[in-house]
Amino acid sequence: MIIPADYHAEGIQFFTPDDFSQQMAYMHHPAGHLIEPHFHNKISRKVFYTQEVLFIKKGKLEVDFYDDIQNYLESHILNAGDVILLASGGHGFTVLDELEMIEIKQGPYTGKQDKTRFIGTKEKK
């Protein structure tokens, strides 16, 4: 799920379904709009997969997408200002231009058991 830097919409647009453990929305409000003070209640949730959000601050990044059995699907180029939610399947990256990015994902980190590494190929099967 990619939100390009030039994406614009009115109001609040959620890109994720309610059952995703990581929610991603775009918000556009006029000056003076009030978002009421609030806090989020402590709620127990079960999270089975890590979902990551990447914000590209600077540079260019190629993202390769794989299905759950490591088959190559497609690639996309991310540029400065783009945001991506990696919600399922596998992914790999090639830095095309010097890169600065911010990664956000669920914790706590569980060490080596958190991910399975594999040899990726850009050939479709």
Which residues does each predicted region cover?
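A short, N-terminal "cap"/entry segment at the start of jelly-roll beta-barrel domains
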Residues: 1-26, 121
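Conserved short histidine dyad/triad with adjacent acidic residue
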Residues: 26-48
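A short, compositionally biased micro-patch
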Residues: 30, 56, 79, 86-87, ...
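Glycine- and acidic-residue-biased ligand/ion/polar-headgroup-sensing regions
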Residues: 30, 49-66
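Short beta-strand His + acidic residue motifs that chelate non-heme Fe in jelly-roll/DSBH
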Residues: 37, 63-64, 84-86, 91-96, ...
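Short acidic-glycine-tyrosine-enriched beta hairpin
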Residues: 67-88
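Double-stranded beta-helix
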Residues: 92-125
